[in-house]
Amino acid sequence: MTHSLRPPKNNEDKKAWVALGSKYEKEFVKLLGKLRIKAEINPQKKADPFAPDLLVEGRVAELKTRRTPFFKTAQYGISPDTATTINKKDIERYIKTNPGMVIFFWVYWPAQESYGVKVKECCGVWFARMDKLKKICDSAPVK
């Protein structure tokens, strides 16, 4: 279960983060299988580690797993209860190669407090097509 997966102690350890991401991808595929949604790790990832993460119902998909709230978003008028991020360079790369690709945000964190900010428990899976997400991000007040 993903509750036992822990982030690397060194935030700059890219190899450890990639390994953790691979574990989350496998767990997410299992979760979708329990929901009778056909999913697998993208076979292209063996040759290209930057290839999209998954194939879901035959469609290319990317997984973003979030396990920590962004407490400081409250300073920008964005609720930290559900705030997340995505790298602009990731969106630009995927728009060029597969604009209709789906991105899944798999989110879980318990209710907690940090930096004087309380957040509620957040648990769920949200998804959007990359081209739609780009439009949202292009018009976002925070870049």
Regions found by a protein language model. Give the residues of each.
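Acidic carboxylate-rich catalytic motifs and surrounding loops in phosphoryl-/glycosyl-chemistry enzymes
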Residues: 41-49, 104-111
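Catalytic cores of nucleic-acid endonucleases
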Residues: 11-18, 64-114
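Structural alpha-beta junctions
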Residues: 34-38, 96-102, 134-135
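Short amphipathic alpha-helices and their capping/turn segments at secondary-structure boundaries
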Residues: 46-58, 93-94
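Acidic-basic catalytic patches of nuclease active cores, encompassing PD-(D/E)XK
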Residues: 1-45
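Non-catalytic C-terminal interaction segments of nucleic acid-processing enzymes
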Residues: 1-4, 23, 31, 106-143
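Conserved catalytic cores of phosphodiester-cleaving nucleases, focusing on short active-site segments
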Residues: 28, 32, 52-75
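A structural signal for short, well-ordered beta-strand segments and their strand-loop junctions
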Residues: 40, 55, 60-62, 102-107
